[in-house]
Every structure is written in C-alpha cells, then in structure tokens.
C-alpha cells in the first residue's frame, strides 16, 4: 500500500548510538538492575521479523486508515532526521509540571523519539517525547527568553553556568540546528498577554470548564494555569485550541463555570467582580478562532504510543470520539485497556509512521508470534512480551504480574510518570512540625502565578467528602491508599481515586480515622510488631530493594520470603503500595506470613496519616 506523504526511511540505529556513549556513562544510581533470566523484551515482535504489513492487515480486517490530513505537524511524518545522540544536554519542560524548565539529557534514541533524563535524578523519572517536540530547547534558551531554569539536584542555583557544567562533566550540548522553529500558526497575536484571564477545559477532568490564566507564552503556544491550583494541572496548547475559550463562554453556552479553589460563594461567581478584584483583563473574545472538528471517526486505524508503556507504539483502532478526544483500542488486546487521548496529542500518528521513522511497531500478537527461549521467564498477562515495568524506565523488563504494566493489579496505577518534585519535597513537608492546615489550602492569590497551594488531586479532595455507608460501598484499602498515603506528596493515581469515588453513591463526610476499619488497630500493631512502631512511611519510601528484603527477613516467620521480594525488585515505594491480595495471590506467600508483612505495611502507612483536622476538613472541589 502506498503511504501518503511518505518520507524516506530514517536510519536510527540505536545500537550505534549506545556505542558512542562510553564517555557519557550515566551516574551509578541510574544503572538498571539485571535479571538472571533473559528478558522477554529481547524477543522481536512479528513486525520486527518482517512478517506483518499495514497493507496486508487493512485488507484482512477490511479496515480504513485514518487519513494523514487529519494529523497535525507534530503527529505526522517528520521532515527531518532525528539528529539527537545519547548524552546530549538540552533544556525542556517537565511533563508533570509544565511551567518548569529543566536540565535534561538524552538517555535513549529510538526512531524519531527520545527518552529524556533529568540530570541529577533517578532514571525512574525519565520520559519519552518526539525529537520535534516544542517542549524541548537548546542549552541557553531559558536565559535568552528569561525563563527560570531548574538546575540539577546538588548544584547551587547562583553557581550554575551551563558551559562550566558541560566542560567539567565532559558533556556535549545538543546542536541548535536540531531545534527548529515550530510555529505553524505564525507569531502570537499581541492580544494574548501573560496574566490575562480566560475559560479553559481541565484536561484531567474534561467535563469541567474552569477559570484560568495565561501563565506563559512561547511562540504560538499558551501555558494555561487554573487559578489557585498547583501547576500539575497546567498545560500548553496552541492559540486555536478548542480547550480555551473567551470569558463568558460558559454562560453563553449553558455550561457551568468552575470558580477558583477557595473562591467565596463559587455558585455566584462573577467575571466582572473577579477581574476587578484581581486587577486583571480578559483575553479579547475576537482573537479566539474556532478550530474545525478533528475529523477522526470510529474504526479508523492508526499508530499510538502506549501510555502504560511509553517506549512502545502499537497498532490501534479508534472506537469512540468526542469533540476534543478519541478513544483508542490496541488491536489484539482486551477492551479494558482502551483509553481516551486528545485528538491533538503528539502520541498518535498515521499508519506507517513507525516504518518511516525507524521505530519498532508493536502489532497484534498471534499465538505463533511469541517465541519463548529455554529457561526464559514469562509474563502471565495475555499479550504482554515482558517489555517495560510498572516502576517506569528504571527497569527495562519484567516477568511477573507484579511488574507488569498491564496486569489487573496495576491496571489503574498511573505508572508512566513519577513526580520527582513532589517526592523531593516530601521529607521537608513531613519534618516541618509547624506545617498547618492553612499552608496546604489555597492562598487566595488569583493572579495566575504559581503559588504553593494544595497539591492534592481534585478527585482525592472529593474523596474526603465521601460518606462510607458500608464495606461494600468503597474499597477501604484503596481509599486508605489515596487519602492517607498520598496526600502529602507520594505518588497517586487520579484514575485510582476516580475508581474509588464511583463505588459510592453518597457524598458527605469520610471517617477521619480510616485505620480503624483495617485489619488491626494501632495498639495491636505496636504489640505484635514492635520493630515497626518508630519507622515512618517517608523512610520506607526511600528503602532500596535490599533494604526491603532485609526488613522482611527480620519479621519472625517471614525469613524465607525475603528472597521473593528481592526477586520481584520491590523497593520501598512499591512495598508501601502492596495489598494483601498482592502478597498472597501474586507473590504466593502463605496467609500467616502475608498478614504479618501486610500489617507492617499498614503500620507504616498509618505513620503517614494526616492530623484529624486535616482529614476531616477536605476542601470543596470543582464540580
């Protein structure tokens, strides 16, 4: 089949790039643990073996490819080769905090994609992006454009100089020619200015339209910030995005506008009063241009980055659409893995994109496609070839349900991106005994600046207002994980919180002491597990795999099970997230020792519990 707008195939031999990286070896902490067994990820897919083609597949399925004209410049076939090499330094946006620009290095090159690493941090925070992404910039861009650069951990801000850093560490900066002007819409209209107000869709909760501010402008893109919320909800979009609308759009279209968090009397929010009180201006309505519908339709085929395992791109089908999004299904996989993605996401591509850019394509598996080598451990999840890990890029593969991003136990976990900034400040928040409720609530500054406000997810805050009617209404273990383990900065999953929310009908107040509903009370824990009493969750979260195994070995009657935790590469954070089901059914540990281990985990979690007043006074959330 003739590919539309096909460019010549790009040569991206990752092995050659790895050979060039001898002098740019990553820090000791970034080294990936090696398994004794051969990783299943070394088995090539059917596509890699040359046994699969889009032309044949479309004929067999009697399917149609999504027309290449529907894809944006960032999604379609690239015009240039990927010239980045492993070890090159650059500046770029932290996907978890879109307002933050960081020192990055290229950790891996695959086709037209890059795995980027935050200098000074563990590789579990690495993320994937396209080589032509507008989120990455050459060394010195922040200084030139007057953006703050977040320097590597361990360096002083006032002492950091790019050229000195590169020279001292014998590093290479990415050449400026690799970063091209990517402004398809021309220069930004002067009508858009930083600090102006508008109404914007919350991409994490697309049913909500909220009061927002233009927090930054780069080329033809806006940084949307939701007033009085932390920057994890921010996002970049172009000026014609359907996600941004002029002030008054909700009122004109019969939609509910969500007022800023902490705004008095949010039901009677008035733009006139708000603009006057904040001494700000609205973006003129005339500068907003209506974008044409995205044009994607159900049953169209395309290639999509797998959000659960972002090093992979899979054959996919659109199964549903709405105004701004498409719902994708990975061919050959169960529909439980389907999810919604923005129609303008850089992670969706026309068919043939992988072939043109030299990126492996994960195709629908057949029984005879999966070849298992003698002595090779096999992931039990149907369709999974053992590539990737729930703990992120730190581990290249897995061979059990515990590490599998697709296993039922991990299906709702948001594992693709860890939040290094929240985890970095965790210890500071815990050690600050004067950290009062008022500090975690909104500061009532609605000027669009990134104040240090409540960083809990909106759905988690809503969970605090749930009334537990009975054990059948809410999974207490999951609710405990959301309310107690996560509020002060450990990883959380919005999808996980949402799942818990949807299991309850009544919304009122939640018990301020969820620990009382768990298998053992605190006093009983202290008596049965005296060695656990003085250890806090923040300490456990920093444990290595060996330290977790050593702790399990120290528990009476659990000595022989320590090797199981070592085999599964369970570190402190993973240990805190284990459930009783994980320990008994997945790790195959007998009930007696499993209960002792699980009750230790509960004890650690309880040490992280918020003060009663903070739990009971959950803030009102949007919607």
Swiss-Prot record:
<dbReference type="InterPro" id="IPR004092">
    <property type="entry name" value="Mbt"/>
</dbReference>
<feature type="repeat" description="MBT 2">
    <location>
        <begin position="160"/>
        <end position="260"/>
    </location>
</feature>
<dbReference type="InterPro" id="IPR013761">
    <property type="entry name" value="SAM/pointed_sf"/>
</dbReference>
<keyword id="KW-0539">Nucleus</keyword>
<feature type="domain" description="SAM">
    <location>
        <begin position="543"/>
        <end position="607"/>
    </location>
</feature>
<comment type="function">
    <text>Putative Polycomb group (PcG) protein. PcG proteins maintain the transcriptionally repressive state of genes, probably via a modification of chromatin, rendering it heritably changed in its expressibility.</text>
</comment>
<feature type="binding site">
    <location>
        <position position="384"/>
    </location>
    <ligand>
        <name>Zn(2+)</name>
    </ligand>
</feature>
<dbReference type="GO" id="GO:0005634">
    <property type="term" value="C:nucleus"/>
</dbReference>
<keyword id="KW-0805">Transcription regulation</keyword>
<dbReference type="Pfam" id="PF01530">
    <property type="entry name" value="zf-C2HC"/>
</dbReference>
<feature type="region of interest" description="Disordered">
    <location>
        <begin position="1"/>
        <end position="44"/>
    </location>
</feature>
<dbReference type="InterPro" id="IPR001660">
    <property type="entry name" value="SAM"/>
</dbReference>
<feature type="repeat" description="MBT 3">
    <location>
        <begin position="269"/>
        <end position="364"/>
    </location>
</feature>
<keyword id="KW-0862">Zinc</keyword>
<feature type="zinc finger region" description="CCHHC-type">
    <location>
        <begin position="370"/>
        <end position="414"/>
    </location>
</feature>
<feature type="binding site">
    <location>
        <position position="379"/>
    </location>
    <ligand>
        <name>Zn(2+)</name>
    </ligand>
</feature>
<dbReference type="GO" id="GO:0045892">
    <property type="term" value="P:negative regulation of DNA-templated transcription"/>
</dbReference>
<keyword id="KW-0804">Transcription</keyword>
<keyword id="KW-0479">Metal-binding</keyword>
<feature type="binding site">
    <location>
        <position position="404"/>
    </location>
    <ligand>
        <name>Zn(2+)</name>
    </ligand>
</feature>
<dbReference type="GO" id="GO:0003682">
    <property type="term" value="F:chromatin binding"/>
</dbReference>
<dbReference type="InterPro" id="IPR050548">
    <property type="entry name" value="PcG_chromatin_remod_factors"/>
</dbReference>
<keyword id="KW-0677">Repeat</keyword>
<feature type="compositionally biased region" description="Basic and acidic residues">
    <location>
        <begin position="10"/>
        <end position="35"/>
    </location>
</feature>
<dbReference type="Pfam" id="PF02820">
    <property type="entry name" value="MBT"/>
</dbReference>
<feature type="binding site">
    <location>
        <position position="398"/>
    </location>
    <ligand>
        <name>Zn(2+)</name>
    </ligand>
</feature>
<protein>
    <recommendedName>
        <fullName>Lethal(3)malignant brain tumor-like protein 4</fullName>
    </recommendedName>
</protein>
<keyword id="KW-0156">Chromatin regulator</keyword>
<dbReference type="GO" id="GO:0008270">
    <property type="term" value="F:zinc ion binding"/>
</dbReference>
<dbReference type="InterPro" id="IPR002515">
    <property type="entry name" value="Znf_C2H2C"/>
</dbReference>
<feature type="repeat" description="MBT 1">
    <location>
        <begin position="52"/>
        <end position="152"/>
    </location>
</feature>
<dbReference type="GO" id="GO:0006325">
    <property type="term" value="P:chromatin organization"/>
</dbReference>
<dbReference type="Pfam" id="PF00536">
    <property type="entry name" value="SAM_1"/>
</dbReference>
<dbReference type="GO" id="GO:0042393">
    <property type="term" value="F:histone binding"/>
</dbReference>
<keyword id="KW-0863">Zinc-finger</keyword>
């Amino acid at each position: 089949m003739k590919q539309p707008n096909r460019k010549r195939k790009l040569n991206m031999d990752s092995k050659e790039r790895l050979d060039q990286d001898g002098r740019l070896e990553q820090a000791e902490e970034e080294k990936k643990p090696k398994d004794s067994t051969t990783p299943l990820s070394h088995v090539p897919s059917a596509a890699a073996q040359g046994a699969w083609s889009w032309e044949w597949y479309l004929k067999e399925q009697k399917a149609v490819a999504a027309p290449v004209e529907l894809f944006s410049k960032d999604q379609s076939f690239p015009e240039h080769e990927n010239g980045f090499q492993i070890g090159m330094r650059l500046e770029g946006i932290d996907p978890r905090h879109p307002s933050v620009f960081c020192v990055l290095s290229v950790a891996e090159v695959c086709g037209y994609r890059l795995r980027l690493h935050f200098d000074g941090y563990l590789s579990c925070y690495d993320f994937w992006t396209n080589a032509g992404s507008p989120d990455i910039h050459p060394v010195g861009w922040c200084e030139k454009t007057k953006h703050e650069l977040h320097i590597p951990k361990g360096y002083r801000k006032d002492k950091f100089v790019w050229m000195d850093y590169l020279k001292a560490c014998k590093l290479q900066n990415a050449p400026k020619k690799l970063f091209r002007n990517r402004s398809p819409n021309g220069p930004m209209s002067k009508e858009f200015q930083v600090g102006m107000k508008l109404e914007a869709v919350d991409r994490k909760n697309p049913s909500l339209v909220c009061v927002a501010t233009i927090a930054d402008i780069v080329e033809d893109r806006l940084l949307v910030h939701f007033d009085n919320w932390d920057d994890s909800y921010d996002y970049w979009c172009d000026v014609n995005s359907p996600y941004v609308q002029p002030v008054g759009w909700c009122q004109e279209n019969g939609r509910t506008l969500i007022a800023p968090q902490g705004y008095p009397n949010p039901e009677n929010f008035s733009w006139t009063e708000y603009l006057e009180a904040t001494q700000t201006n609205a973006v003129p309505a005339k500068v907003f241009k209506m974008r044409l519908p995205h044009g994607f339709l159900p049953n169209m085929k395309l290639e999509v980055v797998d959000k659960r395992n972002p090093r992979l791109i899979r054959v996919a089908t659109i199964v549903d659409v709405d105004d701004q999004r498409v719902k994708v299904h990975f061919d050959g996989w169960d529909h439980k893995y389907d999810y919604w993605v923005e129609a303008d996401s850089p992670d969706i591509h026309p068919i043939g994109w992988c072939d043109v850019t030299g990126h492996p394509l994960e195709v629908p598996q057949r029984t005879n496609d999966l070849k298992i080598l003698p002595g090779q451990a096999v992931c039990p999840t149907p369709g999974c070839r053992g590539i990737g890990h729930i703990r992120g890029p730190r581990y290249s593969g897995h061979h059990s349900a515990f590490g599998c991003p697709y296993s039922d136990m991990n299906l709702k976990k948001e594992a693709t991106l860890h939040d290094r900034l929240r985890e970095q400040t965790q210890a500071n928040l815990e050690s600050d005994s004067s950290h009062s409720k008022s500090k975690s609530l909104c500061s009532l500054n609605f000027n669009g600046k990134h104040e240090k406000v409540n960083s809990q997810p909106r759905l988690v805050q809503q969970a605090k207002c749930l009334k537990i009617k009975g054990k059948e209404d809410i999974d207490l273990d999951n609710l405990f994980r959301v309310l107690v383990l996560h509020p002060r900065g450990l990883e959380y999953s919005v999808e996980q919180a949402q799942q818990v929310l949807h299991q309850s009908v009544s919304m009122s107040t939640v018990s301020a002491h969820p620990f009382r509903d768990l298998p053992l009370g605190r006093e009983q824990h202290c008596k049965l597990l005296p060695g656990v009493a003085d250890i806090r969750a923040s300490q456990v979260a920093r444990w290595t795999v060996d330290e977790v195994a050593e702790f399990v070995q120290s528990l009476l009657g659990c000595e022989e099970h320590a090797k199981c935790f070592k085999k599964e590469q369970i570190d402190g954070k993973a240990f805190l997230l284990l459930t009783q089901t994980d320990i008994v059914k997945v790790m195959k540990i007998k009930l007696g020792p499993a209960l002792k281990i699980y009750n230790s985990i509960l004890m650690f979690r309880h040490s992280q519990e918020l003060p009663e007043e903070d739990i009971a006074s959950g803030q009102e959330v949007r919607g």
